[in-house]
């Protein structure tokens, strides 16, 4: 994946993780997973609900936060660090 992709993904996923935002993750096959993002790396997202699931990023179509989150503030915080 390109660096530009990481510059968008990491602050987005990190904000969802830090703020314990409930998310719906839609997979490319249409399955909907729900939970909170526990962790992530270049290839996978760990999604916690009643159990923790490892979801490969190449299988993810869309991530929808369960509530409004200010991502521009998170990008500024990460840039300042």
Swiss-Prot record:
Q: What GO biological process terms are annotated to this protein in UniProt?
A: regulation of DNA-templated transcription; regulation of RNA stability; regulation of translation, ncRNA-mediated
UniProt xrefs under NCBIfam families? Hfq (TIGR02383), PRK00395.1 (NF001602)
What taxonomic ancestry is recorded?
Bacteria, Pseudomonadati, Pseudomonadota, Betaproteobacteria, Burkholderiales
Keywords, alphabetical = RNA-binding, Stress response
User: Does the keyword section mention RNA-binding?
Assistant: yes
Q: Which domain of life is it from?
A: Bacteria
Q: Which Pfam families match?
A: Hfq
- Known InterPro entries for this protein? Hfq, LSM_dom_sf, Sm
Name under which the protein is recorded: RNA-binding protein Hfq
State the family named in the UniProt similarity comment for this chain.
Belongs to the Hfq family.
Q: Where is the Sm domain?
A: 10-69
The record describes its quaternary structure and partners as: Homohexamer.
A GO term for molecular function: RNA binding
Q: What does this protein do?
A: RNA chaperone that binds small regulatory RNA (sRNAs) and mRNAs to facilitate mRNA translational regulation in response to envelope stress, environmental stress and changes in metabolite concentrations. Also binds with high specificity to tRNAs.
Q: Which GO terms describe its cellular component?
A: cytosol
Chain's gene name: hfq
């Amino acid at each position: 994946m390109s660096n530009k992709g990481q510059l968008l993904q990491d602050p987005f996923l990190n904000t969802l993780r830090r703020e314990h935002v409930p998310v719906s993750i839609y997979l490319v096959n249409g399955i909907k997973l729900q939970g909170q993002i526990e962790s992530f790396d270049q290839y996978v997202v760990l999604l916690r609900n009643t159990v923790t699931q490892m979801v490969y990023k190449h299988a993810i179509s869309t991530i929808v936060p369960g509530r409004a989150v200010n991502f521009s503030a998170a990008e500024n915080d990460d840039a300042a660090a």
